[in-house]
A protein has these predicted regions:
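Extracytoplasmic/periplasmic sensor domains and loops in membrane signaling proteins
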Residues: 124-132, 165-203
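Short, small/polar residue-rich loop motifs at catalytic or cofactor-binding pockets
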Residues: 142-145, 213-214
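Helix-start (N-cap) segments at beta->loop->alpha junctions
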Residues: 232-236
Length: 236
């Protein structure tokens, strides 16, 4: 029975490694980060004790194949979203709705009586007007997507999705989940989303709300300058 269990774990680990290899092939352009992740993935066969947790991220069998179809379509979606977001910001600057200096200003102003702390900026009133249509359209057409947001290079998200921009209630637990707009997400994953300039970056992490999430981001450029990133969180 023990030998059979070991063989089963080994087969499951092989499947997980296979899926990770596929993902790493897809994101090979992620350079050193991808190579490090692939190196770590090849050692998963020795981590049978963690298979239950690992399998929550990399699904097996038919479910795993279905998940791979989701992973494979995300790079094109996020890069197109980043391109459109950059165009929206360029059009706003060209139309005199704000200056380039306003958009790249990071002297955020704390919004009183908010916890976690929220911030206003010289550009969030604009993004509140122009981001929701783009972000909402992507959410509506991709049911596996949980969030689709723009972030500057510091992890500041000026305008979150409507589902995560509910009116503040004063109840910390409710607001923590229901209103995530205008926060600086400076966790290790959030910091990378706006800083990197790779074609796209896929990260898998446990969200601060407890969910395991895949996050893919692509850089947003405005008149040739790197403003931040377009960030998509999805389940697969």
């Amino acid at each position: 029975a023990i030998a059979a269990a070991i063989n089963t774990h080994s087969r499951e680990a092989d499947q997980i490694v296979g899926h990770v290899r596929q993902i790493m092939d897809m994101v090979g352009r992620n350079s050193a980060g991808a190579k490090e992740t692939l190196s770590e993935a090849t050692s998963l066969s020795g981590l049978a004790v963690n298979l239950k947790e690992i399998s929550r991220v990399f699904k097996l069998g038919a479910a795993g194949e279905l998940a791979m179809t989701v992973h494979k379509k995300m790079p094109d979606i996020v890069r197109d979203g980043a391109r459109q977001m950059g165009m929206l910001l360029e059009q706003a600057i060209a139309g005199g709705q704000l200056s380039e200096a306003d958009l790249f200003d990071d002297a955020y102003r704390p919004i009183p009586n908010t916890r976690p702390q929220k911030y206003s900026s010289r550009f969030d009133s604009l993004t509140d007007r122009i981001f929701p249509v783009l972000q909402g359209r992507l959410l509506d057409s991709n049911p596996e997507v949980v969030y689709a947001i723009g972030t500057d290079q510091n992890g500041y998200v000026p305008t979150h999705n409507k589902r995560f921009s509910q009116p503040l209630t004063g109840d910390y637990d409710k607001d923590f989940v229901g209103n995530r707009s205008k926060r600086v997400f400076d966790d290790p994953v959030g910091k990378q989303c706006g800083k990197h300039e790779m074609p796209f970056l896929i990260q898998t992490y446990r969200r601060d709300t407890g969910e395991i999430m895949h996050d893919i981001s692509a850089p947003v450029y405005v008149n040739g300058r790197h403003w931040g990133g377009f960030r998509i969180g999805y389940r697969a």
